[in-house]
Amino acid sequence: MQNISEQQVKGSKLPNVICMLPGSSDKVIIVGAHFDRVSEGDGVVDNWSSASLLPSFYEGLKNGPHKHTYIFIGFTDEEQGEVGSRFYARQMTKDQVAATDAMVNLDTLGLGPTKVWVSHSDKRLTDALVQTATRLNLPVAGVNVEQIGASSDGEQFAERKIARITIHSFSQEAFNARIIHTSKDKLSAIRLDDYHQTYRLLATYLASLDQFGGSLPVPTAH
């Protein structure tokens, strides 16, 4: 994996980790996941389940032609208030913001089938994910998490008027099980079949986003 850099973040001991996969145009798709965790549990679900997939998505995209430059980012200190993503988003220049067609945020995967935080996701990006899932015959559903006080790194990009989507696996069942931010957050909490389906869906989805221009039209399902 080439083009890896570390971005020192003011106030954080650990940097953001950034990997760029250059495309043939100046347009950009950001794919992000935080790698930090709270002290309770192992942090497997929240959020190594997401951060550990970033290299796999890179490998899946690197050998095919693509117009967009994909920027994969492991964000630091999300659990401290989206510190890493806030720093990254705020240091983006106006030209960088204008060039960014989408920000795909991954947080807490593998508790069950793929979910989307619909109320905090761009409708066009959400529609494109649903169409991809339909094409692959894979499950996806909308579950909003703001009512439990949740937030995530995608919100920092929304403040810069960048289209974003947050993909997760949270549900009422998972909430009732009290897995997140507890000692139950360990490998045994991951439902591997659901996790693999989420990976398949996201790998295809990220590739399909390259078809989009700045207006992000929804591609025709086939």
What do the PLM-derived regions correspond to, one by one?
Residues M1-P22:
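A non-catalytic alpha/beta surface segment that caps or lines the substrate-entry region
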Residues S24-D26, H34-R37, L109, Q172-N176:
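Short connector loops/turns at beta-strand edges and beta->alpha or beta->beta junctions
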Residues M20-S25, V218-P219:
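N-terminal hydrophobic or amphipathic helices/low-complexity stretches enriched
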Residues P113-H222:
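Active-site-adjacent substrate-binding region
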Residues V17-M20, V28-G32, I71-G74, D101-L106, ...:
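Structural recognition of the beta-strand scaffold that forms the well-ordered cores
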Residues Q2-V9, I73-F75, V143-V145:
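Conserved beta-strand termini and adjacent loop/short-helix elements that scaffold enzyme active sites
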Residues K13, R37-T132, G149-G154:
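Acidic/histidine-rich catalytic neighborhood of metal-dependent amide-processing enzymes
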